[in-house]
Amino acid sequence: MSEIYSFYAMMSRIKYIHRWGLMKNTRNENLSEHSLEVSMIAHALGVINNKRFDGSINPERLAVLAMFHDVSEIITGDLPTPVKYDNRKITNAYKELEEQARLSLLKMLPDDIAEVYRSILCEDENELLLWKYVKAADTISALIKCTEELIMGNAEYSKIKQ
């Protein structure tokens, strides 16, 4: 039973992971706040898709995927985007590191419960469209952060917003 507690204890560490580490910030943001915002945006995108464009996406599933989309960073930390995408070799190595981190988190759970979380933490071919929505929500969240920083007079974010 203590295995379960290890997983949730690790999940609770999400609030200690700071984002935008290479940037001067007028307001610091942690991964917990970011995950909630991305979840809310992803849910909204799903609702808008269904109501305005006659779609059939499950907004609740989007919200859950988005809620957990960056949990690997509990182990890896938040690698700044310019570093993460500097070249294909670094990008591929970091993606592998993130995958290993997700698998490490899943190993903290009994098999029956890990099965549920595996479908949330690990991208599935059958849900590629949902993951595209999560990525879009993540990008919108970054745009919101840049806009907020610019409104507060932090010109350092002007290049990122472009």
Label for each model-derived stretch:
Residues 1-162:
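Alpha-helical, largely C-terminal catalytic domains
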